[in-house]
Amino acid sequence: MIKFLGHAGFLYETNNEIILMDPWMSKEGAFDSSWYQFPSNHDLGDDIRDIITDTNKEIYIYISHEHKDHFDVPYLRTLELSKINFITPKFRRDHVASVLHKLNPKSVT
């Protein structure tokens, strides 16, 4: 199953795993609240949180880059991070991975 979450976000679910891509779910928007999701999608954030909490599947979240409309740290902090494996591209600087490591997830690669 593939579900569009708005903006650049997708949820992909198989029999064994769940993969989230660039989940931007915060009600506060991004860039000092000058950008908002259209249409609004923050109500899906609770659904995703429930899926993560209730599943025994392996969970991966892919963060494509550090812009706040792709790397929604306030929302990520609301998730059960000890169950989540984060995947990031190799960047010249390690800002995304560094922030993710501080959240104490299951893994960051």
PLM segments and residue spans:
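Residues that flank catalytic or metal-binding motifs in active/ligand-binding sites
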Residues: 6-8, 82
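Extreme N-terminal starter segment of soluble prokaryotic enzymes
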Residues: 1-3
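Active-site beta-strand termini and strand-to-loop segments that position acidic
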Residues: 12-16
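Pre-active-site segment of Zn-dependent metallo-hydrolases
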Residues: 17-62, 73-78
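Metallo-beta-lactamase
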Residues: 84-109
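Active-site environment of divalent metal-dependent phosphoester hydrolases
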Residues: 8-11, 26-28, 66-71, 93-96
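Hydrophobic beta-strand segments of well-ordered beta-sheets in folded domains
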Residues: 58-61, 83-87
